[in-house]
Amino acid sequence: MLLYSDLTYAINGAAFHVYNKLGHGFLEAVYQEALEIEFQRRNIPYEREKELKITYDGVELKQTYKADFVCYGKIIVELKAVSALEDAHRSQVYNYLHATGYKLGLLLNFGSSDELEKERIVL
């Protein structure tokens, strides 16, 4: 069974709704604001631009990472508005998971003209 499958299903449903309403072509900030509204409407618990501590070899760093969203207190949701996801985007989420101790990240790209691109990244 997939990690947090029911929770990611709810998050993806909200993201699909936003993509179907807005389509592609907006800045990432537009999708972030719309997705926040959709999370509220669907009672999906979230924190927007949550500052996360990063640890290196057991030591907490001064630098932090701001996740676009953390949903349900355990899923990092990273938004993009680019023509296609690239390995650098996947690596970014993987590194965030590794550095913060979270186990699951969702990478959502609203910039594709074909459909909402979504990827699960599991640590």
Stretches found by the model and what they are:
Residues M1-P45, I121-L123:
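Solvent-exposed, charged helical/coil patches
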Residues G23, A67-L85, Y96:
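Conserved catalytic cores of phosphodiester-cleaving nucleases, focusing on short active-site segments
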Residues G25-L27, E60, K103, S113:
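Gly/Ser/Thr-rich beta-alpha loop segments that engage phosphate groups in nucleotides
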Residues Q40-D57:
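A short acidic/basic microdomain associated with nuclease active sites
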Residues K80-L123:
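Nucleic-acid nuclease catalytic cores
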